[in-house]
Amino acid sequence: MDRRRMPLWALLLLWSPCTFSLPTGTTFERIPLKKMPSVREILEERGVDMTRLSAEWDVFTKRSSLTDLISPVVLTNYLNSQYYGEIGIGTPPQTFKVIFDTGSANLWVPSTKCSRLYLACGIHSLYESSDSSSYMENGDDFTIHYGSGRVKGFLSQDSVTVGGITVTQTFGEVTELPLIPFMLAQFDGVLGMGFPAQAVGGVTPVFDHILSQGVLKEKVFSVYYNRGPHLLGGEVVLGGSDPEHYQGDFHYVSLSKTDSWQITMKGVSVGSSTLLCEEGCEVVVDTGSSFISAPTSSLKLIMQALGAKEKRLHEYVVSCSQVPTLPDISFNLGGRAYTLSSTDYVLQYPNRRDKLCTVALHAMDIPPPTGPVWVLGATFIRKFYTEFDRHNNRIGFALAR
């Protein structure tokens, strides 16, 4: 296996925000997030036809495997991901930009042992085990399949620092990294914030290690995504929530499954008409996905009500001049309607010449027993500050400021 370092010139492409924490003695920690253009936005601006890429990458089933273990979970659509924070791995810490992903439970980053055949590795921060005094070898194979591609490597153990808290963690050193989307991605890896049952190979997730230390005020974490175009994209708070970023009280919805961030939705309305899910639909609240996703048949009903047209596979557009007149879309969660206006669920790309705007809802079809399931991603979380409560197995929503 090639153990040489990848070129350091690529590090010039990386951003380096400071990770900070609250003053000593407090019992929750903040991780600031940066907002960058998604891979999809970059490709759109360069005039790339997304039809083929959508067909290959908008596949919302992934098989996570360690040796012969395969477990289906909902796939985060990293092609559209925008929000990243920094963590440190090793002693002294090596810094990585990661997506905090409630749809998965493993931590992985690219390794210096990544083959030079995988060009995407050359533009990311790479973990070097020999530079860390706290590294411990594991060596078990690690593979995650994404549609037609895969992320592959092996497991290692080292110190991981998140928001000022350090734990000893087993994580994936990735040695095979697909060109798309990772060649253009602003993030290096993924930090799964899901449950132990979702983790590849029985690895204990990072947040569970943090909980075991007993340092947090509450067994919760919360996510805020800034709705503006600012580079300061939001924050993840471990152990609590930040009232500066939401108004009113949290409304909580109990998990429908105790091993994932999944709840039951009792209605989807467009304008004043309830079109779907009156008998109940399952929905995953996924911080790693940018869009709201629905089964194809359900999405078509919503798009018909909006008058949207399918431009390419699973992607719908409307005339930008039409946006102010589009109806609200509401999701009934725990007996309460959470409403998105057209400015919340329609994306406007200034550089597009066709004057079309993209509806931030995509099609997703997951077969039983995992599906069918909806996904509420950043399109929803930007409007509603979200708290993930492990102690009470529930998710809380409050209107974001």
Swiss-Prot record:
Enzyme Commission no: 3.4.23.15
Locations listed in the record: Secreted
GO biological process: gene expression; positive regulation of blood pressure; proteolysis
Keyword list, A-Z: Aspartyl protease, Cleavage on pair of basic residues, Disulfide bond, Hydrolase, Protease, Secreted, Signal, Zymogen
Tissue expression notes: Submandibular gland.
Role of this protein: Renin is a highly specific endopeptidase, related to pepsin, whose only known function is to generate angiotensin I from angiotensinogen in the plasma, initiating a cascade of reactions that produce an elevation of blood pressure and increased sodium retention by the kidney.
Family: Belongs to the peptidase A1 family.
Protein name listed in UniProt: Renin-2
Organism: Mus musculus (Mouse)
